[in-house]
């Protein structure tokens, strides 16, 4: 197989990765599409962070053991969608998927993959600043997603509530501080990111959709990893940690209720 797109959420990768071996040829490329900090982020990063493995993302190193670093092409997906029913996805807005090599180089394989995606009707810019783009999306994911799960609110509802928007802004400031510690200066401001979310309107984040559907939430890749990185960098992460802890308990309670609902006579 020439190319494999990993379309599952980050928390499903540890189970999926060991099963990829039968479809991997000598030169198979694997495109990661997950939100949050990807498992490969510090492979080839250089400096004191080189080779760091985040246990919250790659427990026991099972993903990195199954997927060689040379195979990976990163991507950032800019689609807003909603799952209406199993196998039925409503597209709300956006048709862009950015592709890039983790080392920032320009490659023929990225160009070929982009050509196929563009031919299908998607926008597919190639980026040499993949990690910077990841942090722009993380800025929103780490703040809007958990707060939406806790409040059951849409993007526009959160942004237009002064108290809630203040919480979101505080989380974004902490995320920005982590990115700066890693040498990733964000190309957009916090206010621009908030304004962009408001334009999307009455959209439920993926984390809220998962909560309402009884599915596991993508909490560790979107929020837990940011807390872990901030702590490693000596940053307080006060607001992010509070929201993370509350959302983690929410996920645990939801999972227990889901299991109880499946018990006969419960």
How would you label these PLM feature ranges?
Residues 12-13, 39, 106, 215, ...:
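Alpha-helix N-cap/loop-to-helix initiation residues
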Residues 1, 23, 62-137, 143, ...:
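Internal alpha-helical scaffold of NAD(P)-dependent oxidoreductase catalytic cores
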Residues 38-40, 82, 134, 196, ...:
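Generic structural signal for helix capping and beta-alpha/helix-loop junctions
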Residues 1-84:
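Rossmann-like NAD(P)(H) cofactor-binding subdomain of soluble oxidoreductases
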């Amino acid at each position: 197989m020439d190319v494999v797109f990993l379309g599952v959420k980050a928390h499903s990768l540890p189970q999926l990765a060991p099963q990829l071996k039968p479809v991997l040829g000598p030169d198979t490329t694997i495109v990661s599409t997950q939100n949050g900090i990807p498992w490969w982020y510090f492979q080839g990063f250089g400096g004191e962070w080189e080779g760091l493995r985040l246990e919250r993302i790659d427990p026991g190193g099972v993903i990195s053991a199954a997927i060689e670093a040379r195979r990976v092409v990163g991507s950032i997906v800019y689609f807003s969608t909603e799952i209406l029913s199993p196998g039925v996805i409503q597209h709300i807005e956006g048709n862009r998927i950015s592709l890039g090599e983790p080392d920032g180089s320009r490659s023929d394989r990225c160009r070929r993959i982009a050509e196929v995606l563009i031919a299908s009707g998607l926008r597919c810019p190639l980026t040499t600043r993949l990690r910077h783009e990841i942090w722009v999306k993380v800025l929103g994911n780490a703040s809007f997603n958990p707060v939406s799960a806790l409040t059951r609110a849409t993007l526009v509802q959160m942004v237009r509530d002064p108290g809630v928007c203040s919480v979101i802004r505080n989380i974004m400031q902490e995320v920005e501080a982590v990115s700066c510690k890693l040498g990733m200066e964000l190309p957009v401001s916090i206010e621009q990111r908030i304004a962009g979310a408001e334009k999307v309107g009455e959209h439920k984040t993926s984390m809220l959709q998962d909560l309402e559907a009884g599915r596991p939430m993508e909490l560790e890749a979107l929020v837990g990893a940011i807390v872990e990185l901030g702590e490693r960098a000596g940053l307080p992460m006060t607001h992010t940690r509070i929201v993370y802890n509350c959302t983690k308990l929410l996920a645990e309670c939801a999972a227990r209720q889901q299991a109880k609902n499946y018990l006969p006579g419960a």
